Amino acid sequence: MWAAEAAFARSGSWREEEDEQEALRWAALQRLPTVARARRGLLRSPAPGEDRVQGDDALCEVDVAGLSPGDRTALVDRLLADSGDVEDFFRRIRSRFDAVQIEFPKIEVRYEDLTVDAYVHVGSRALPTIPNFICNMTEAFLRHLRIYRGGRVKLPILDNVSGIIRPSRMTLLLGPPSSGKTTLLLALAGRLGPGLKVSGNITYNGHHLNEFVPQRTSAYVSQQDWHASEMTVRETLEFAGRCQGVGIKYDMLVELLRREKNEGIKPDEDLDVFMKALALEGKQTSLVAEYIMKVYGLDICADTIVGDEMIKGISGGQKKRLTTGELLVGSARVLFMDEISTGLDSATTYQIIKYLRHSTHALDGTTIISLLQPAPETYELFDDVILISEGQIVYQGPREYAVDFFAGMGFRCPERKNVADFLQEVLSKKDQQQYWCHYDYPYQYVSVSKFAEAFKTFVIGKRLHDELAVPYNRHRNHPAALSTSNYGVRRLELLKSNFQWQHLLMKRNSFIYVFKFIQLLLVALITMTVFFRSTMHRDSVDDGIIYLGALYFAIVMILFNGFTEVSLLVTKLPILYKHRDLHFYPPWAYTLPSWLLSIPTSLIESGMWVLVTYYVVGYDPQFTRCLGQFLLLFFLHQTSLALFRVMASLGRNMIVANTFGSFALLVVMILGGFIITKESIPAWWIWGYWISPMMYAQNAISVNEFLGHSWSQQFANQNITLGEAILTGYGLFKEKYWFWIGVGALFGYAIVLNFLFTLFLTLLNPIGNIQAVVSKDDIQHRAPRRKNGKLALELRSYLHSASLNGHNLKDQKGMVLPFQPLSMCFKNINYYVDVPAELKSQGIVEDRLQLLIDVTGAFRPGILTALVGVSGAGKTTLMDVLAGRKTGGLIEGSITISGYPKNQETFTRISGYCEQNDVHSPCLTVIESLLYSACLRLPSHVDVNTRRVFVEEVMELVELNALSGALVGLPGVNGLSTEQRKRLTIAVELVANPSIVFMDEPTSGLDARSAAIVMRTVRNIVNTGRTIVCTIHQPSIDIFESFDELLFMKRGGQLIYAGPLGSKSRNLVEFFEAIPGVPKIRDGYNPAAWMLEVTSTQMEQILGVDFAEYYRQSKLFQQTQEMVDILSRPRRESKELTFATKYSQPFFAQYAACLWKQNLSYWRNPQYTAVRFFYTVIISLMFGTICWKFGSRRETQHDIFNAMGAMYAAVLFIGITNATSVQPVISIERFVSYRERAAGMYSALPFAFSLVTVEFPYILVQSLIYGTIFYSLGSFEWTAVKFLWYLFFMYFTLLYFTFYGMMTTAITPNHTVAPIIAAPFYTLWNLFCGFMIPRKRIPAWWRWYYWANPVSWTLYGLLTSQFGDLDQPLLLADGITTTTAVDFLRDHFGFRHDFLGVVAGMVAGFCVLFAVVFALAIKYLNFQRR
């Protein structure tokens, strides 16, 4: 006992001693100057030499800028754990400032009489056809010259709106699609683009936007999640924090520390360290990133890369949270957040909004957030609501009075109705009547304009008007509230951060650079064996020409190797534009590090080439000349990288940038002095010769070689060396100083081009091709002065979807085409997949992973069934298994259709599957998409008129009549809104007249009103007697209770409920409430949310109940089993459904339908077709004027070489451009075909052959454009035979290049990988085509590849068809010997005119070869994994 007392006494004295030591440490810290004290803090850590235990921590003085990752994590965990929740944590921060009477800067945002108008095209004029594209370009040019201002219709987006966004209050922005929410947020953030007409005033604390920097004062969180896919979540947030800086945090902290010291206040140690670390952010610490990851739930994926469609990374919901968190690590006092909950479940959205609410209240921030479908508990977190529709503000004020305003107008929110949903639906003409509560008076539709006018007389509206009438007192503005600096960190720090960021990206993309190095090494090895020194001589001018070809190929390779910068930069541009617009850093802070970091790659590539080729080829052996070649290739590579960065920043679109890059490369090479000699370039193009980097490289590398000792022998008794004769004969300079002129010029080009890259990145914006579709009624309502038109499409990025006006449809039971109602039963379904290697590495020993476990159920005609479960429960997996959409894995169990075993080929004909991704051909209109689907999926005996009537009935059923002529477009880019695209997906399946329809998440990503429209569509379909099943993710009460039956799955792929919902979900609620311990549902609470909460994994652990086992033991399970047993037996009078053929249509009907669609798609894809034609016109004019009358010059060997050079350059560059530009087009169409082929619309071969066929007329036009212009300007011999031969070879050459691009896309997963696979073959075709080294000079071991090279056959045909029959004298390069063109072509190249027919057959044969391989790849290769 005495020992115990002594121990307690020692413990007490030890604690007193610790307290004294802590007091001494604090006193020592307080004696430091304030600035030094801001960097030091007391951090609780284990006593030295002891393990961390509860209550056994000691305070240690630390530098807050140097906290270890473990200390940062532990500090954040302690703070949030001690506070209990985020609200208490923010309250502690606020209390610390209040204790010393420091106020936070407040910002009030006002907008008065704000009007924003867009200019749009209407009707068929809005479709992106080739003629419309040309008209748009012409009109834009004339408008720029102020000559023409017509052609477009004005559409109001925001119509004279006014309001106040108050500090310390959370504002919710609600409104239906196309109401102007995004435009309002962009306008308030000072981010509207130049294409809109804006009037009105926007002020922050009474200051106009031009008096400060709004991009630094506020932060706009976009709907788009643009991030560097190679970076982890932590790295993304840390980089954003370093760029944005700490703003006023540091100054406020210093003042706080000064006042606390004066008043003798000792703050909490952990909170003190936390606030100091946040105020010193932007240096090396990342505590703010750690904190944001913790409160946003991103800590579980902190070290996971962000990823994209190519790289597996974080989920879509996590990416959306990262987008928000990226700006919260900054110092903006005003937050504009645009639909930040897309892809998030309601619980996560609630936590995020809750954090923002407490942050706004405690720190006096100003926050406005637009949400799609806020849950009731989320809606309650907001202080104010702004309700906007048709560009007019209907209500703005406290959330509590919004319902009262509409009640005064005669519209009441039902008891079980989400208020946010009510506010959006009450403005809709389709939904308004159900909320009318003045039954004594007849209902009349109240328009948005009437609501807006009524609000002005409402008490809240009057108060708002009175407040706006009194100008903001600018003297109340806190001096630190509005940012006047463009950037939050010093320029040097930004440069350093960018350097580290880009270095990290280079390391993460190291496989690209390694692949380029390996590719260059392989080509260097091939070059070494082609120009092998044992076959290379130095005896004549002809030998010199071979060396010139080798040097030229080296230059071309180094120049070509920079082309990958185009795709790499275009992929990064959205991120760079986002960073630029948010004022993360100036563009030069990005371009300078990118230039510096490219130096090592240039050193490696040029060094590798010289090291492998120089001495093996047999160049001049002097070491100084070897170093000279290395130095020259290094600066050429730097010039090449800069040139293609300029083209990428100028093009800004992959297809356009690739075209620009090809054009730049072509201009540089054709005027470089090798393909066409200097003497042969016309006077009007000689300026191009002098500004071509290739010219300086060609002259410098040639002088470096041919003035060497190896070429010093005297030439033909003349007073010059052989080397000088070669230089002179090829129009090259022979003075030594031209080497240094070349090096200096290339260095200068690298500097100038990098400057232009910076300039374009600063001045140019993303190409504004984002569009939306607005219905005819809507645009007439908004702009009554406009003449009637069908559709308005071209709204850029300011309208993201459309409101749909019309009348409710009656339930439809009969349609023009009958169908057979069918049921589907499935029993004991199990599904297994192979365990991925990454999971095995984590300790999983099984070879197979089971995703579905003994799932049993049934879907019946006229019954709408919901398939619900948390993420990972297996909802989509089950539906894919039942629909036969899985491409891998093992399936067990039985599936029957109306009692007969399911046959997949038959089932495809009678079922429809609406995928979540809404994949459609982007260049078709709505009605064309439906007619196309109906043509291929309805039986062949259905005539055209009946098919058309049926399609129109389906359009009426899904409410798409008003949008029949609208372009489908690409998701998030142009065309239909998300909600309209959902309904199109349903309609496309419905026109197949299916008996069973599967729908995967039909309401995901939609606002409440759009979701209601989609569900009304679904209910209409069910009422026709079809069998429908939908997966659904946490639906609202209205949506959930529109279903008849429910299949509820828990994580792991097990059913825990299968049966009817009952009225107001009574059956479901009674089933789960009968389980002991399950909490009862609250009145008015969403049954879907309740059932997910009470059946969670945590609840299972608390209750000790396995809900799947409970269901299997229940009476409900027995009833389901009995129903399945009954439906699994066919009726006596029934027959098994069979079809005579696999597809509805025969082969040629499939081919004709696919060709019809592809023809429309090509006609409406001007970025591909029109740009290709425009590029061809420019190239043909340029080549024709450069090669002026080349075809009529036939006196010397150089004349033949010049003509061949022009043909070679045209074939190679126009061909490669065709191959590159077709790859994204084929990739999109192949992606669409995966869905269409899975639906049984057609087989692979008709689809592939339609893509091959549709190119024929476009390539023909391209060939005619180039052939006619170039042939005329080049003055080739105008005979019918020679001209037709020229057109023939150009046509089939461009055709096989295009088919080659299609083939490389078909054999690779996507159009990003396709160019990488295709590029090495372009290089080999270039090397072995016979231009740089004739066939007779190619070593015997490589000569076979000359015959396997399609470009060599093209040059054979083009040159021989034009010059192969000429008998006139031809002067050779030595200036002495003469021969005939026939003999020269035969002796030098091995070309014979009588072989022309075989050559033509070979060129056409390559077209057939590539087309067949493309078709077979489409048929047998499937890169979609489900």
Curated annotation (Swiss-Prot):
Alphabetically, the GO molecular function entries are: ABC-type transporter activity; ATP binding; ATP hydrolysis activity
Which Pfam families does this one have? ABC2_membrane, ABC2_membrane_7, ABC_tran, ABC_trans_N, PDR_assoc
Topology term for the membrane: Multi-pass membrane protein
Q: Which residues form the ABC transporter domain?
A: 142-415, 824-1076
User: What's one GO-annotated cellular component?
Assistant: membrane
Q: Which InterPro entries match?
A: AAA+_ATPase, ABC2_TM, ABC_trans_N, ABC_transporter-like_ATP-bd, ABCG_dom, ABCG_PDR_1, ABCG_PDR_2, P-loop_NTPase
Question: Domain ABC transmembrane type-2: where?
Answer: 493-706, 1149-1363
Primary site of residence: membrane
**Key words, A-Z:** ATP-binding, Membrane, Nucleotide-binding, Repeat, Transmembrane, Transmembrane helix, Transport
Q: Which PROSITE patterns match?
A: ABC_TRANSPORTER_2
Q: Which family does it belong to?
A: Belongs to the ABC transporter superfamily. ABCG family. PDR (TC 3.A.1.205) subfamily.
Functional summary from the UniProt entry: May be a general defense protein.
The protein in question is named ABC transporter G family member 31
The gene name reads: ABCG31
